[in-house]
Design a protein with these regions (language model features):
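Structural preference for beta-rich elements and adjacent junctions enriched in aromatics
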Residues: 21-286
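Extracellular/lumenal mature domains of secreted and surface-exposed proteins
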Residues: 274-358
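C-terminal segment of classical bacterial N-terminal signal peptides
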Residues: 12-20
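Long, low-complexity, intrinsically disordered N-terminal extensions of eukaryotic proteins, enriched
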Residues: 6, 18-19, 345
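Sec-dependent N-terminal signal peptides
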Residues: 3-13
Length: 358
């Protein structure tokens, strides 16, 4: 089989990343892809999420209470979670809606109702807190610097009231603020009352999130159809007499998912649904293979049952290959046009001066 240069590029850029073992291996949850013009506004209003089908919703029926082995009772606690993403943005969007018969949020520390989320963007697995490591013993400082580096844990206060919206259980609290995260919450109840809460937020998963800050960090690359490791738990406090006793409702059906990325579950980053797409869409990208030779590889990313491709490179030459490699004779900035077509119609994409060679 002849492997062209462009085929090699496509292979290297689309090959699946290796993933560790997951909890509930027979179950795969889905992350809805929002169209780029319908990104949710983080304002505590779930209206933007109406386009997400109910099949994406994760309810209380998918969670197990692992601390006390309590039975599900929607009159005590009931939840709904939807996950979203936008192609081209390395963000995870979350809508959390909950009913609780007793909302606890008047204590300054962690003794209150919490939505706890753990994400492992590159499926590296393994402990993310030193207490769960068995391979070596870390001293206090090394343990602190290890915490949350390759997978992140967010303790999200529901509601936060006068606290920061979440506590990052790690050495990198900077990941909870802009431009890495944002959140909004709406509710009308008071502490100790029953009622409904709506929480909207987005976070940025990191393959490497160090104590020093974002300068050395590595953001996880979110790609269509990729699997990420993720799980969440609802910590449900019910007030006196024991503020320290709470229910731990886990999507992984384990308790230590809070600190072990190998106990997360699979979430697939879904493609854009056809209802948001045209039958035929032209799109493409390129890579400069050799600037000295002005050698450029063009890569088709069009959508639809296309059977023809016409590339106009802006220098008077044309190609009908799907993924051509072109050499420019002269330096300059070029207007490149791709026209695709088939039985469903045609479309074209023009990029002005993106392709520049010297």
């Amino acid at each position: 089989m002849r492997l062209t240069f462009v085929s090699l590029i496509l292979l290297l850029t689309t090959c699946a990343r290796p993933c560790q073992a997951f909890e509930r291996p027979d179950r795969e949850f889905r992350v809805f892809q929002f169209p780029k013009h319908m990104i949710p506004c983080i304002d505590g209003d779930p209206l933007d999420w109406d386009i997400v089908p109910d099949s994406y919703r994760i309810g209380l029926d998918q969670l197990e209470e692992t601390a006390n082995h309590a039975a599900r009772d929607p009159n005590n606690l009931n939840i709904s979670v939807k996950m979203g993403w936008v192609k081209g943005l390395n963000r995870l969007y979350v809508l959390y809606e909950a009913y609780d018969d007793y909302w606890e949020f008047d204590i300054p520390g962690l003794d209150g109702d919490i939505f706890e989320l753990v994400v492992d963007g590159d499926c590296s697995g393994g402990p993310l807190i030193p207490e769960l490591r068995t391979d070596l013993k870390l001293d206090d400082r090394n343990g602190f610097l290890f915490r949350g580096v390759h997978a992140q844990n967010y303790h999200i206060f529901t509601p936060a009231a006068d606290k920061e919206w979440c506590m990052v259980w790690g050495c990198q609290p900077w990941i909870a603020g802009l431009p890495w995260a944002n959140a909004a919450c709406s509710y009308t109840f008071r502490h100790g009352e029953s009622g409904r809460l709506t929480l909207e937020f987005w976070i940025t998963p990191f393959d490497y999130a160090p104590f020093e800050g974002p300068g050395r960090a590595a953001v996880s690359r979110l790609e269509e159809n990729a699997i990420i490791g993720l799980s969440f738990a609802v910590l449900d406090h019910d007030g006196p007499p024991d503020h320290h006793r709470f229910g731990f409702w886990s999507l992984s059906h384990t308790t230590t998912m809070y600190g072990n990325a190998s106990e997360l579950v699979k979430f697939r980053l879904m493609p854009l649904e056809n209802r948001f797409r045209k039958q035929v869409e032209a799109d493409w990208t390129f890579r400069v293979v050799d600037m000295d030779r002005r050698l450029v590889a063009f890569i088709d990313r069009s959508h639809g049952p296309n059977t023809s491709w016409r590339w106009e490179f802006g220098d008077g030459t044309v190609s009908t290959e799907r993924n051509p490699v072109h050499t420019y004779e002269k330096p300059g900035s070029y207007v490149v046009v791709l026209t695709v077509g088939g039985h469903a119609g045609s479309a074209r994409m023009v990029k002005v001066w993106d392709v520049t060679v010297k």
